[in-house]
């Protein structure tokens, strides 16, 4: 009966006007209920796990555009975005809809609750990376005031942070750490060979200027890196774009 009820709600919503609230509700139902959401996430992380061992072994390979030479002797690292890449914020999205509000209302409060769950496939990927001796870095556009809560949330899910380095790089943690993640990727590239990057927004892989360019320019840029996608770059895609996005209005993502 629950499945039938969901289908009836979903079909009924198709007849509604395309309001922001309607789009948000459709996306929330999709993420909460659908096999497609689960299979998309698991599929991407399974593919990433298949590729990771060989990338670790190939000392002459880097996944970072910021890293052009002198990296072969550096230890391997992976970079992951957090929101809708590692942590699932669908409960926050549902809360917005229930209260008739829009992002960023209540965003900081939600993060400080430390209740987000892993996206499907994340836990297994992080375990594999650790077993291969790969350092894990999280580069997020959550703001610096949310660092402790974000760290706590990840630790509650079982991730163990190093006591010797900063693996959680927040927006605004340093003056130069803006919405553009380039400087943070460069900082990691100074000491590590970046073998893989995982995100849910083009800006998790390229500069902010490229990410905020025209649709045609963004598409051309994406095509320029065909050999990276599905090899060392993995992008999770959801039907609901993040409100934080400059080009689309989607579920909170750290892009």
Feature-to-residue mapping (PLM):
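Bacterial Sec-dependent N-terminal signal peptides
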Residues: 1-24
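Non-catalytic pre-domain segments flanking phosphatase-related domains
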Residues: 16-80, 255
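Asp-based phosphoryl-transfer active-site loop
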Residues: 78-88
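Active-site neighborhood of HAD-like aspartate-dependent phosphohydrolases
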Residues: 86-117
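Short, acidic loop-to-helix structural element flanking the phosphoryl-transfer center
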Residues: 108-136, 144
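Substrate-recognition/cap helix-loop segment adjacent to the acidic, metal-dependent catalytic center
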Residues: 131, 142-168
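Conserved Lys-Pro-Asp/Glu-containing loop-to-beta segment of HAD-superfamily phosphomonoesterases
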Residues: 179, 183-206
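Conserved small/polar residues in nucleotide/adenosyl-binding loops
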Residues: 238-243
């Amino acid at each position: 009966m629950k499945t039938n009820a969901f289908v009836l709600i979903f079909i009924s919503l198709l007849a509604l006007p395309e309001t922001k609230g309607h789009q948000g509700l459709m996306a929330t139902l999709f993420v909460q209920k659908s096999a497609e959401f689960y299979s998309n996430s698991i599929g991407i992380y399974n593919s990433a796990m298949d590729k990771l061992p060989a990338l670790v072994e190939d000392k002459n390979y880097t996944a970072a555009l910021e890293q052009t030479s002198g990296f072969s002797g550096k230890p391997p690292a992976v970079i992951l975005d957090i929101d809708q890449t590692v942590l699932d914020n669908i409960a926050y999205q549902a809360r917005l809809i229930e209260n008739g509000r829009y992002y960023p209302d209540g965003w900081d409060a939600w993060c400080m609750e430390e209740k987000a769950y892993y996206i499907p496939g994340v836990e297994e990927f992080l375990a594999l990376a650790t077993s291969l001796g790969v350092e894990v870095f999280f580069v997020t556009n959550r703001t610096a005031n949310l660092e402790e809560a974000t760290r706590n949330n990840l630790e509650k899910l079982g991730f163990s942070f190093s006591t010797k380095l900063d693996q959680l790089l927040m927006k605004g943690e340093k003056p130069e750490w803006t919405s553009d993640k380039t400087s943070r990727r460069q900082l990691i590239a100074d000491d590590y060979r970046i073998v893989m990057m995982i995100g849910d927004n083009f800006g998790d892989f390229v500069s902010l200027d490229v990410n905020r360019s025209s649709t045609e320019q963004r598409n051309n840029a994406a095509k320029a890196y065909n050999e990276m996608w599905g090899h060392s770059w993995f992008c999770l895609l959801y039907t609901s774009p993040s409100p934080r996005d400059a080009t689309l209005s989607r579920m909170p993502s750290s892009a």
